[in-house]
């Protein structure tokens, strides 16, 4: 991986790291809110629509298996280019899907591309950014994704409203991915002028030969801190699955759903840098625990509102509260994994840590879909809320042990 001195300026990462993340986030943000509605239009029931919505995080989990190896072998830039090309293919497949199963495969591939894309930028930031401002830098990276998830739903809703076609949200993703490719191909990457060891040779020398080997070698920290990160991932993925499903179940249109999700994403985006300041000044714990408790309580509240006369108003309020709570924890998974990763070759560990977080992110919406199939969406929502509060306790116990707070200089 790259090596770096402490002569760092934020503008040096703005275009090579943050702009591609923003564009990719816009594309994802346009597509995610309408996935359950499109799945329903292709013949899926409410539980089936939830299952298809979960495919994006299942794809991310599958992508975590080779992503650390891929980034270590071919580098961050080439990995992002490959991920952008895969996402274009996935969304094209979604546009031409003739049934729910084909659409689900497309969403899975989109998640796969997102995993490689995200890890490539995180690996670059981990080695390029000094430790003294790492949390702020990684929160800013997370904020660039969140800015995309904020802008994407609004652009998607606008296009759907103007054209009357939900397919325009998918076309927006393709456009964003093409721009990402252009940016990556023509823009200078700071890593090109930095000392770079032979990552393939280093990878073999350090015997970082695979994801599951890395997981085994770091099983202690991954069980204790990674399990909590898995709950964080589960809460976030459940939010992205439950809110659009809830909108379908109370009869909201695709355009209205995208607008409400966008409002929640705006609250999320507004707090990304504040999250980094909290982590750098007070410690990682004071970001993640309030975030998880806030999201858990919001989901518990939502679970009791489905049949109330003001169900739509409650839905809007909860979407905003969840956005605020998630924003307070912006960048926490990337920051914790960067804190714990070895400096010389962080990508395999980052992939392993992301795998544990994405395992939770994949299991949570699958569990939601299963509970909806046998019981109700309200029960599934309440259970996820309780698990979120329990996860806050796991991290409150283990973060001080593995990542003791050191005040920024």
Predicted features and spans:
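Juxtamembrane intracellular "pre-TM" segments in multi-pass secondary transporters
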Residues: 2-11, 189-225
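Helix-loop boundary and gating motifs at the non-cytosolic
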Residues: 8-54, 221-228, 233-246, 250
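Core transmembrane helices of Major Facilitator Superfamily
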Residues: 28, 110-121, 321-333
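Helix-to-loop junctions at the C-terminal end of transmembrane segments
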Residues: 63-75, 271-284, 372
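C-terminal ends and interior cores of transmembrane alpha-helices
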Residues: 86-98, 294-308
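Cytoplasmic helix-loop-helix junction between adjacent transmembrane helices
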Residues: 108-145
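Symmetry-related core transmembrane helices of the 12-TM Major Facilitator Superfamily/SLC fold
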Residues: 169-185, 381-396
